[in-house]
């Protein structure tokens, strides 16, 4: 043994290192911190908007940023659920998906219609999807305003599209959004609405879109207050 690696061994080492780098560099630690802060501020604004729609105290916790894929979502999340796609038309190029549990959508819809949040029998229909789309339009619209201030440019969204998803094991091509077929960024929040909702909501992002949002906001990491829960009442 002369201690000299063969070309095959060198190639194998390089390939292994490339694979590790690909996994590790989905987001850097600073990007994870930045998107967490962006989500924290944006969802705080959204909580205030939701309070005005349902007339109940709304609490949304500080976010937890992680990486996920379709198989993990299928295994971990309640079925069926509602996916709301939010696309950006100005200032950012991309989209994200907000995931809500079916029961939570029914409660929010009933409250928006002037009910007490208990009329949740039956399957989700067009009324529910229309109502939650409008709620998300207002919530994410207010979040876009906050994001505009952070990024110092105008951010606009397209009308959200809501769809019931049964979380099958197989993701059909073109279903919801193509980025779900690969590893994506998951941002989880705990949400409470009065004494009616005590649940988890998720935002799903393609990594490239997260990186775009994180540009120019690193200063927030040094000037923002400590993590906190947002409550609207």
Predicted features, each with a name:
Residues 222-233:
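Single conserved hydrophobic/aromatic residue that forms the stacking wall/gate
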Residues 19-31:
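Generic N-terminal amphipathic, Lys/Arg-enriched alpha-helix
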Residues 2-8, 28, 32-221:
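Composition-driven recognition of glycine/serine/threonine/acidic- and proline-rich low-complexity segments
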Residues 5-22:
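N-terminal intrinsically disordered, low-complexity tails
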């Amino acid at each position: 043994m002369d201690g000299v690696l063969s070309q095959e061994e060198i190639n194998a080492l390089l390939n292994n290192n490339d694979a590790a780098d690909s996994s590790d560099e989905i987001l850097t630690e600073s990007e994870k911190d930045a998107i967490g802060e962006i989500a924290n501020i944006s969802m705080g604004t959204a909580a205030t908007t939701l309070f005005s729609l349902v007339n109940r105290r709304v609490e949304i916790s500080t976010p937890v940023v992680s990486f996920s894929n379709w198989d993990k979502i299928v295994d971990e999340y309640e079925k069926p659920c509602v996916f709301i796609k939010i696309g950006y038309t100005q200032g950012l190029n991309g989209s994200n998906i907000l995931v809500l549990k079916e029961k939570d959508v029914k409660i929010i819809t009933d409250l928006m219609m002037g009910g007490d949040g208990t009329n949740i029998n039956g399957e989700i229909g067009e009324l529910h999807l229309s109502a939650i789309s409008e709620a998300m339009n207002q919530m994410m619209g207010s979040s876009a305003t906050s994001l505009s201030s952070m990024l110092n440019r105008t951010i606009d969204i397209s009308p959200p599209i809501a769809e019931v998803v049964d979380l099958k094991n197989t993701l059909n091509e073109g279903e919801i959004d193509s980025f779900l077929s690969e590893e994506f960024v998951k941002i989880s929040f705990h949400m409470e609405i009065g004494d009616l909702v005590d649940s988890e909501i998720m935002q799903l992002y393609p990594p490239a879109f997260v990186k775009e949002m994180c540009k120019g906001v690193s200063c927030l990491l040094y000037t923002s207050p400590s993590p906190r829960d947002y409550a609207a009442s």
